[in-house]
């Protein structure tokens, strides 16, 4: 089994990067036959800007550019996709959001039938989300941030494409908590990555066929 671990943080010495490494270690420890790839979006200088060229891809007027096609191929090779990211303003960083905007394109991640019904094309994909935040859990619950992130990311992005979000973790108090606690959690997630993925029932919830990109 193969995991693609996508990390979005500019500092290679960050806790976010360390957690990604621990997830990878857990994947290897679970079964020597498992494999993983860490996609460091900052190190590879992925351009997150959604340009006119990307809009042409969305309209099916042009094929995906080389950098987008390469990321799609990475995901196609994976049995599980793991996103590891710091939480900026109660959501994912622009680098990761732009990666999703460009890579999860019309025709590859989703499509529309002749009668404008949504066709979810990533039903085979199992997704694990690991957000790293500085605030405590009470803050996320009291203000509704945790639910808002699930609505936007778990449901709004991945369910729209048919992908099953198997686990969605918030590792909080990142600047106060003993890093070992979060590292142990990340390693355990890696160990169980493919076990829990098998339990995913991907019926999804309904979206209508409305285009998720505004053309105005």
Predicted segment positions?
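Conserved anion/nucleotide-ligand pocket segment
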Residues: 162-166
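N-terminal beta1-alpha1-beta2 submodule of the flavodoxin-like/Rossmannoid cofactor-binding fold
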Residues: 1-108, 167, 173-176, 180-216
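Short, glycine-/small-residue-rich phosphate/pyrophosphate-handling segment
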Residues: 111-161
């Amino acid at each position: 089994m193969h995991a693609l671990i996508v990390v979005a943080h500019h500092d290679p010495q960050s806790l976010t990067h360390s957690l990604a490494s621990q997830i990878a270690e857990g994947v290897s420890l679970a079964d020597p036959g498992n494999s993983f790839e860490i996609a460091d979006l900052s190190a590879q200088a992925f351009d997150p800007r959604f340009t006119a060229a990307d809009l042409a891809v969305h309209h099916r007027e042009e094929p995906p550019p080389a950098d987008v096609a390469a990321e799609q191929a990475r995901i196609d090779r994976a049995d599980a996709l793991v996103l590891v990211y710091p939480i900026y303003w109660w959501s994912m960083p622009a680098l990761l959001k732009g990666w999703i905007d460009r890579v999860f394109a019309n025709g590859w991640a989703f499509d529309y039938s002749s009668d404008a019904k949504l066709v979810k094309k990533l039903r085979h994909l199992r997704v694990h989300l690991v957000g790293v935040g500085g605030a405590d859990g009470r803050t996320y619950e009291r203000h509704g941030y945790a639910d808002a992130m699930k609505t936007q990311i778990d449901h709004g992005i991945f369910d729209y494409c048919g992908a099953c979000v198997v686990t969605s973790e918030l590792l909080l108090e990142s600047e106060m908590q003993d890093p070992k606690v979060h590292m142990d959690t990340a390693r355990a997630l890696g160990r169980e990555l493919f076990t829990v993925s098998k339990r995913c029932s991907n019926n999804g919830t309904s979206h209508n066929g409305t285009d998720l990109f505004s053309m105005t």
